[in-house]
């Protein structure tokens, strides 16, 4: 195993532990707690893949971080922090919407770029609204937390979510996953509308009618790639 991979995992485990302490002391907000839960799943998946114990990795990460802080001058730390842009957290969905359980009559799923696309293909002739919670860096979607598709009545009919055991995803991965989801839902004559935040930060444009800017041919092509759930 590459030593950098081990070091990265150890530091991630220790930083997650520090964030957990903040949460336990009620020193953080809801988006912080939401990311904390998802990152915990991701670390468990990575630990299983790498064959590393989380507690041992956390202790190793603590030593690494402490050594860095001891050797780093305060002035250098201030400069590094000031020059690093802070991501923003965009929330289309409420805590209830993002955590609600949902079920599929005709399940379909596909993995693409570290993301899981799930949809209920029993849904027909509905107006579907796409909502997402994600972080933004440099005015562009950085990390997707969750994207869900809702009917006008509020029922959840599809979802895109990161796979904890797989590495991160890019903006293009998210756009491709949304294209697959749209294609699958439009195959059954559903009308899709994406939130303004999704359009702005994923595609960098705004569509007045709320429709995502994907050409019909791409939607149909992606729809054919959606495979039955095993």
From Swiss-Prot:
Residues 1-73 are annotated as: RNA-binding and homodimerization. It is found in: Host nucleus; Host cytoplasm. Residues 223-230 are annotated as: PABPN1-binding. GO terms for cellular component: host cell cytoplasm; host cell nucleus. GO terms for molecular function: protein serine/threonine kinase inhibitor activity; RNA binding. It comes from the Viruses. Coiled coil: none annotated. A motif (Nuclear localization signal) lies at residues 34-38. Belongs to the influenza A viruses NS1 family. Homodimer. Interacts with host TRIM25 (via coiled coil); this interaction specifically inhibits TRIM25 multimerization and TRIM25-mediated RIGI CARD ubiquitination. Interacts with human EIF2AK2/PKR, CPSF4, IVNS1ABP and PABPN1. This is Non-structural protein 1. It comes from Influenza A virus (strain A/Equine/Jillin/1/1989 H3N8). The gene is NS.
């Amino acid at each position: 195993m590459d030593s950098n991979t081990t070091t990265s995992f150890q530091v991630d485990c220790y930083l997650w532990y520090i964030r957990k302490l903040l949460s336990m002391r009620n020193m953080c907000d809801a988006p912080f707690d939401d990311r904390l839960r998802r990152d915990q799943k991701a670390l468990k998946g990575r630990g299983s893949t790498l064959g590393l114990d989380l507690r041992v990795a956390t202790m190793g990460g603590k030593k690494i971080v402490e050594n860095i802080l001891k050797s780093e001058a305060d002035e250098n730390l201030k400069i590094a922090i000031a020059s690093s842009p802070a991501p923003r957290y965009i929330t289309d969905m409420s805590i209830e919407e993002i955590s609600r359980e949902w079920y599929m009559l005709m399940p379909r799923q596909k993995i693409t770029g570290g993301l899981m696309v799930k949809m209920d293909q029993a849904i027909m002739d509905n107006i579907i609204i796409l909502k997402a919670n994600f972080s933004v860096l440099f005015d562009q979607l950085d990390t997707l937390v969750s994207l869900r598709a809702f009917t006008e009545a509020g029922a959840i009919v599809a979802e895109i979510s990161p796979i904890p055991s797989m590495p991160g995803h890019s903006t293009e991965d998210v756009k491709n996953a949304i294209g697959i989801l749209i294609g699958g839902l439009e195959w059954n004559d559903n009308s899709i509308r994406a939130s303004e935040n999704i359009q702005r930060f994923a595609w960098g444009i705004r569509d007045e009618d709320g429709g995502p800017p994907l050409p019909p041919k791409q939607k149909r092509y992606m729809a054919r790639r959606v495979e039955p759930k095993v």
